[in-house]
UniProtKB/Swiss-Prot annotation:
Its cofactor is Mn(2+); Mg(2+). Its EC number is 3.1.26.4. Belongs to the RNase HII family. InterPro entries: RNase_H2_suA, RNase_HII/HIII, RNase_HII/HIII_dom, RNase_HII_arc, RNaseH-like_sf, RNaseH_sf. This is Ribonuclease HII. The gene is rnhB. It comes from the Archaea. It is found in: Cytoplasm. GO terms for molecular function: manganese ion binding; RNA binding; RNA-DNA hybrid ribonuclease activity. It is an enzyme of class 3 (hydrolase). CDD domains: RNase_HII_archaea_like. It holds the Pfam family RNase_HII.
Length: 220
């Protein structure tokens, strides 16, 4: 029986894409994931993740990566949880090899509801099991987590080559906030790599617009 794991990387940052990773393997080969040291990507260094990524590509029967742009995130008409479920479905339906069982790291406080959302969108029959911290419980979800994280890390490096050093991209990072302010101050807008609906970006935009209005009023 083929089993799949699904996880994401980059849900919280104000910069960069949300990345969905899907991994598929025959249930009898799960042991091979353990043998190479697959575990939750958050417990691994970037170097360890890169090494495991290469090994995973050889071991897995199939895998798929989906990038969700900041524009898609900003223009969504529903919650982040629903967007995530929707994109999980797109990724799962894009697999060459369809699994009979799917393990998902639940973004919803109600894992059963999250599983139902995914099952409803599948174009094939499969059992969907959604759990919190599934990436720490199931090796196949850990594999998906590693694929998503490595892909996002690579994307972030490409963005840094183009836009400069913006830190981790997380709202709590002082370097990220500094970069957002400097960029907006210089160009009067954010580049397409920024999630404009995130509070950090909105506050910067509001502050600069307010200052501009005050300046315009003064100059009149």
């Amino acid at each position: 029986m083929k089993v799949a794991g699904v996880d994401e990387a980059g849900r919280g940052p104000v910069i960069g894409p949300l990345v969905i990773g899907v991994a598929v393997i025959d249930e009898k080969n799960i042991e091979r994931l353990r043998d190479i040291g697959v575990k939750d990507s958050k417990q691994l260094t970037p170097g360890q993740r890169e090494k495991l990524f290469s090994k995973l590509i050889d071991i897995l029967d199939d895998y798929y990566v989906l990038l969700v742009t900041p524009k898609e995130i900003d223009e969504r008409h529903h919650s982040m949880n629903e967007l995530e479920a929707e994109k999980f479905v797109v990724a799962l339906n894009s697999l060459r090899i369809k699994p009979q069982k799917i393990y998902v790291d639940s973004a919803d406080v109600d894992p059963k509801r999250f599983a139902s959302l995914i099952k409803a969108g599948l174009k094939y029959e499969a059992t969907v099991i959604a759990e919190h911290k599934a990436d720490a419980k199931y090796e196949i979800v850990s594999a998906a987590s590693i694929i998503a994280k490595v892909t996002r890390d690579r994307e972030i490096e490409k963005l840094k080559q183009k836009y400069g050093e913006f830190g981790s991209g997380y709202p709590s990072d002082p370097r990220t906030k500094e970069w957002l302010e400097e960029y907006y101050k210089q160009y009067g807008d954010f580049p397409p790599i920024v999630r404009r609906t995130w509070e950090t970006a909105r506050k910067i935009e509001e502050r600069f617009r307010k200052n501009q209005l005050t300046l315009d009023k003064f100059l009149k």
